[in-house]
């Protein structure tokens, strides 16, 4: 039997699989774990009372996180003319139209977010099979197809969580990094859940926010008490 590492021992000692933790307790556990050679993200999984097979119960959107994600995102923008100039001024890393499309087709995807002006969708639409599977396809529902590309770039750079419920009815997204304070994570969680509550489908019945789990990239999943987050604060 292999020997447990210090990290594994701490997880076994501090995380009980059947217990519901407060956010403060969960963040404390993640921050106390022995550090790895890279900066871990803090991720959240939210089980919703929806049926994603029904088109009117697909919950998706984007939330500007007050404390950011701790990661600087590379942003590509499909735009031309004044919109392209505005995107560059806002800090976009790559801006273009057909030339940018050729880069994408060649496999040059060195960016985390793709934004498009409405008149650029004729070009972007041809890239669906490349961008779609990577979660990079611009969509107006999450604010990445917009006439105000500068604002979208600023939001992405400042720290924005985009999300879409998966086939199991769960939303997964990043809300910070290990090392964030409890207050920073709390601000981000509250902002995210406020948006998710507002996006509750009218046809969703019963408990909407069923389960919340906090984790780090290589850390344990810690179940939070969902009750405090089911109503607006």
Curated annotation (Swiss-Prot):
GO terms for molecular function: rRNA binding; structural constituent of ribosome; tRNA binding. SUPFAM superfamilies: Ribosomal protein L1 (SSF56808). The keyword Hydrolase does not apply. Keywords: Repressor, Ribonucleoprotein, Ribosomal protein, RNA-binding, rRNA-binding, Translation regulation, tRNA-binding. Pfam families: Ribosomal_L1. GO terms for cellular component: cytosolic large ribosomal subunit. InterPro entries: Ribosom_uL1_bac-type, Ribosomal_uL1, Ribosomal_uL1-like, Ribosomal_uL1/biogenesis, Ribosomal_uL1_3-a/b-sand, Ribosomal_uL1_CS. One of its GO terms (biological process) is translation. The keyword Repressor applies. It comes from the Bacteria. Part of the 50S ribosomal subunit. Belongs to the universal ribosomal protein uL1 family. Binds directly to 23S rRNA. The L1 stalk is quite mobile in the ribosome, and is involved in E site tRNA release. This is Large ribosomal subunit protein uL1. The gene is rplA.
